[in-house]
Structure formats: structure tokens, C-alpha cells
């Protein structure tokens, strides 16, 4: 868990450009990682690979050598881990308690008159593993990196038992030196694991992180960090510039200021997300002509099939009844309604909520529209709706409300659009928008964090002037780490 925390905290950084994402990890968040921290240590310490120990036997009437092999950890109890903030730009952690048991084999050859070979076992027990580490978060190549500012390590007590051997007097010649070297090796390997290996892994991961990440169908998430985060006595906070765009396009929309208020309730973390990010996504998607959909006879399981028919009975309601020219020239056909954005859609986040505005062109074609290029008519539709965001199943999701549609005629080759038909078409458009929005919001945006640590489903989402703030605790999804 300390590994997860170091990666998570390292991703907190600051950009000199006005930020679009801000992350704050509070004392409560540090306590979460502290409480769970022993799990990753148990996993890492068990993987320690002890080197072979060799040394000469210099006492007694002869000479010889001793080799210690197959040293391995047979039992490990993690020390207690406590993380702390280290102003102005870092984080520290310390450990106390815990124990480790190590077993291995020794082989000795002692030459008096003739070589004498003997062997046995070694058992060691180390108690109270104490580590103090402070790391500073820096920036390298637009990516965060960890640097060790201060570090100390000690094992308070190490007891070694040397057993076996057919000639005790030979064993007594090297027992003190063997015990000393095993003690040093245990201290050394624990120190490397608890201090160096974890940080090297964190920096390796951080250095390998791409800053241009494809998230779906040529849509890319970009981010960059340029300055260190801010660490105080109660939280560590960093900012980054981020956007989501199509292909290799750029986004030059204005970025609005995000305040630093978090309210009075205590959470483990707070996340600020600027409306710049979804609006950049909409801008690039509109520029690439990707924001379009077709309502045809098969849309939403054929719900609008009868209305889109050019021919219908006297008691039925269809588009052919409103426009006889369709029934005359295209009998028993269907009309496709192709919707596409006429201007860049806009998402507005206010304290009162989130609203979306779309200006759509609606072109009418004989179905299928891909085979009939003549536009029968064009309408303009102004669509607005509100979004109520939520976190469901570890994804940022939501529902839409207050959908309004206003349609006006732009041009037509099939006759004038009267208000009765416009009203029917507005209802159809509203239903289509709801179907598409509900489908997209149901999928949502998955919110993974670091190594099975994610946000709680009861996270609070607050809309402010130009941004959303997510106030959340962390939860850990248990997996087997053996």
C-alpha cells in the first residue's frame, strides 16, 4: 500500500499554465494508506533474494572457509506504517515494530592436517524494523518523480542461531562472524526493500507514463506537470493541465479559475475537474464531424418506424400524411433524420448544476440516407438539458433532466413545416436525445486509481462555477497478492 500511495501522491503535481485538474490528499487519506500499508510490504519483503555469504575461518590451528546459502524469509510480520506530510513539497513515512524470520544453510571446510567438511543450519529472527524516509516530489520531463531527501533504517534486535556440525569446536571458530554477517545482511536487504526498491518502482512507473494517452477511438487524454505540489500540515495538493481531444488536435478554450473550498465534512481526497476538459472533448469531436446520429426506422428498436413512413393508413400518423409529395414520389418508403452539430456544443457548470446546449442541423433523406444524397429538408434544433452527475460502480455517471427542444425550419423541398409537425418532431428529438444520453451516461467514465484503490460509491459531487469537485473516501478492492 505504501507503493500505491507513493504512486498516487507522485501524480499530484503543478503546472505553470492554469490548471484543469486539482487533487488534494488529506490526513484522512494518508491514514487510509497507513492502515492498509502492511499488505504491500508483506508482498515485497517475501521476494527478497539474499546473496550467498562467504568468509574465511582464521581462528584455531588451521584455516578454512564458510559459505552460507539458501537464505530465505520463512515468516514476516509487517511493521506499523505511518505516513506524514512534509511541507513544502514532500511526504514522509516511518515504520515501527514487525518481525522477520530467516532460515538458511551453512557449509564449512576446515583444513588442519586434512580437509574437514561439516555443515548445518542458521536461523535468524529480527524484531522491530524502524525506518524513517522523506521524499520530495519533483518534475522530470513533464512527469512527476520522487527524490529521497532523508532516510534512515535500523533493526532493533537480530538474534542468530547457528546449529548442526559434527565438530562443535570448529563451529565455535566461526559462529560469531557468521552471526554478525547474517545480521548485517538482514538489515541491508530490509533497508534496500523498504527504502530503495519501492521508490525505484514508483519512479519507473511514473517515467513510463505516456502524456498522450488514447482512451477510445482516437480520443486522447493529455496531461503535463511542470512544478512541485504543495504540502501543508493537513494535506498535499497539486495541479495539472489536462484535456481530452480527438487525434492530435489542440484546445485553446479559456480556462476558468477553480476555488480551493472543500466544505466542512472530512474526506480522504478532493478532486477538482474543470469544464474545460469536457468542452475540449466536444470542440475536437465537433471539428472532426463526429457528433452526429441518425434516427431511422430501426432506431430504439423501431419506436419511430410508423412515423417515419411515407405511406400510412387514414387513421395513422406518419410523415407522408404531413407531406403528400413524399407519398406521391416515394410511396412505401421511410425517411431518415440525420442530426449533426451545427456549432460546438457547450457544457456549463454552475453552482445550480450542469447544463448542456446543442445546436443541431436536422437533415431529412429518403432511407437509407447514405444512398440518397438529396436533402429533402433541413431544420435547426436547439437542444438543452441538465445533467445530474453521480458515481456508480466506480464510474462517473449521471442522469439527464429538463430536456427541451426547439425546432425551426431552415429550408425545404417537400413543403412547409407546420407547427403540428414541428411539435411532433420536437417530441421525437427529445426522446432520441434521452435515449442516446442515457446510453452514454450509463457507460460512464471509469475512475480507477492506483492498484485496486478507487473511490467510494458514496462520493459527493459538488458543482461550482466552472468546475466539478468530487469529495470522496478511498476503498480497496481486495485481490490475492500472493
Residue ranges and their predicted role:
Residues 1-10:
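Classical eukaryotic N-terminal signal peptides for Sec-dependent ER targeting/secretion
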Residues 3-4, 15-101, 156-482:
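Extended, low-charge, aliphatic-rich alpha-helical segments
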Amino acid at each position: 500500500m505504501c507503493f500505491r500511495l507513493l504512486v498516487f501522491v507522485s501524480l499530484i503535481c503543478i503546472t505553470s499554465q492554469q490548471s484543469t485538474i486539482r487533487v488534494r490528499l488529506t490526513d484522512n487519506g494518508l491514514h487510509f494508506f497507513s492502515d492498509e500499508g502492511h499488505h504491500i510490504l508483506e508482498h515485497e519483503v517475501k521476494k527478497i533474494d539474499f546473496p550467498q555469504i562467504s568468509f574465511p575461518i582464521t581462528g584455531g590451528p588451521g584455516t578454512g572457509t564458510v559459505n552460507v546459502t539458501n537464505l530465505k524469509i520463512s515468516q514476516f510480520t509487517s511493521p506499523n506504517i505511518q505516513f506524514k506530510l512534509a511541507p513544502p513539497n514532500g511526504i514522509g513515512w516511518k515504520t515501527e515494530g514487525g518481525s522477520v524470520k530467516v532460515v538458511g544453510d551453512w557449509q564449512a571446510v576446515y583444513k588442519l592436517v586434512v580437509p574437514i567438511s561439516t555443515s548445518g543450519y542458521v536461523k535468524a529472527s529480527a524484531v522491530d524494523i524502524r525506518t524513517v524516509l522523506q521524499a520530495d516530489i519533483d518534475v522530470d520531463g513533464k512527469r512527476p518523480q520522487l527524490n529521497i531527501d532523508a532516510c534512515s533504517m535500523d533493526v532493533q534486535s537480530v538474534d542468530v542461531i547457528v546449529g548442526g556440525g559434527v565438530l562443535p569446536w570448529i563451529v565455535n571458530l566461526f559462529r560469531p562472524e557468521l552471526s554478525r554477517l547474517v545480521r548485517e545482511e538482514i538489515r541491508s536487504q530490509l533497508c534496500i526493500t523498504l527504502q530503495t526498491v519501492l521508490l525505484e518502482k514508483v519512479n519507473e512507473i511514473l517515467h513510463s507514463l505516456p502524456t498522450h494517452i488514447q482512451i477510445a477511438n482516437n480520443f486522447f487524454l493529455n496531461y503535463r506537470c511542470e512544478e512541485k505540489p504543495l504540502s501543508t500540515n493537513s494535506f498535499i495538493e497539486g495541479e495539472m493541465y489536462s484535456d481530452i481531444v480527438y487525434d492530435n488536435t489542440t484546445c485553446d478554450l479559456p480556462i476558468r479559475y477553480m476555488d480551493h473550498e472543500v466544505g466542512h465534512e472530512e474526506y480522504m481526497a478532493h478532486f477538482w475537474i474543470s469544464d474545460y476538459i469536457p468542452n475540449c472533448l466536444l470542440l475536437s469531436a465537433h471539428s472532426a464531424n463526429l457528433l452526429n446520429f441518425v434516427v431511422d426506422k430501426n432506431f430504439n428498436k423501431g419506436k419511430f418506424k410508423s412515423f417515419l413512413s411515407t405511406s400510412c393508413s387514414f387513421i395513422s400518423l406518419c410523415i407522408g400524411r404531413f407531406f403528400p409529395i413524399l407519398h406521391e414520389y416515394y410511396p412505401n418508403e421511410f425517411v431518415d433524420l440525420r442530426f449533426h452539430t451545427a456549432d460546438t456544443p457547450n457544457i456549463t457548470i454552475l453552482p445550480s448544476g450542469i447544463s448542456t446546449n446543442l445546436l443541431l442541423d436536422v437533415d431529412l433523406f429518403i432511407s437509407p440516407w447514405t444512398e440518397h444524397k438529396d436533402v429533402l429538408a433541413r431544420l435547426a434544433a436547439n437542444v438543452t438539458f441538465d445533467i445530474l452527475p453521480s458515481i456508480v460502480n466506480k464510474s462517473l455517471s449521471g442522469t439527464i433532466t429538463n430536456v427541451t427542444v426547439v425546432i425551426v425550419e431552415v429550408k425545404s423541398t417537400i413543403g412547409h413545416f407546420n407547427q403540428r409537425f414541428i411539435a411532433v418532431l420536437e417530441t421525437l428529438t427529445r426522446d432520441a436525445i434521452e435515449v442516446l444520453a442515457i446510453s452514454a451516461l450509463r457507460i460512464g467514465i471509469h475512475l480507477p486509481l492506483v492498484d485496486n484503490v478507487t473511490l467510494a460509491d458514496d462520493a459527493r459531487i459538488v458543482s461550482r462555477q466552472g468546475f466539478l469537485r468530487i469529495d470522496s473516501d478511498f476503498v480497496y478492492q481486495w485481490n490475492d497478492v500472493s
